[in-house]
Amino acid sequence: MAVFTPSYPLTFPTVVGVQTQRFSLVRTVAVSSSPFTGQDQIVQHEGEYWTTQIKFPPMLKNNASVILAFLLQLRGRRGTFSIGDQDRKTIQGTATGTVRVNGASQTGNQIALDGFTASRANVFKAGDYIQIGSYLYMVTEDVNANGSGEADVKIEPSLRQGIETINNDATVIYTNAKTIMRLDSNETGWDTDQVSKYGITLSATEAL
């Protein structure tokens, strides 16, 4: 008996768009409040990850079949797929061409990039997404390139250096940026009505 294993991460289907999407960044922050003074002690741990909840528009069987085949190939929480914020596939900034990581072994919430047009303003705008390696980051301040086409870019969440190596000269994706996600449940289900309209939803969390 042959056993077929899909090649993960799968490509998110585009046969229909999404009706609604919630996209969130979850952080792991511990808060301990003193019962005597009311003062808080805050500790931010390393854990931070994107989550999404998607509702597809009502669809007929032919389109629903594509979505269902995609979901079933994920095999519950086993498989992964690539997806980003479906309403923010393009940047507001002026960046063009190939942008690259400028220096290896970078960590934290700022990354040095190069390959921008020299002295160009607003190459990225606050709220733009960029993808470095397999993972997704949001730019948190407007970015201007210097005379050498370089810029330091502030991002959230922190770089995933401990999960995936970030190499010098790695290409930075800024159009249709994505991350890798995994379904939140091992159960895959869908609804249908009397005219064969399908209702399909999914919930997923970044696969770190």
Identify the meaning behind each predicted range.
Residues M1-L208:
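Extracellular/virion structural assembly segments
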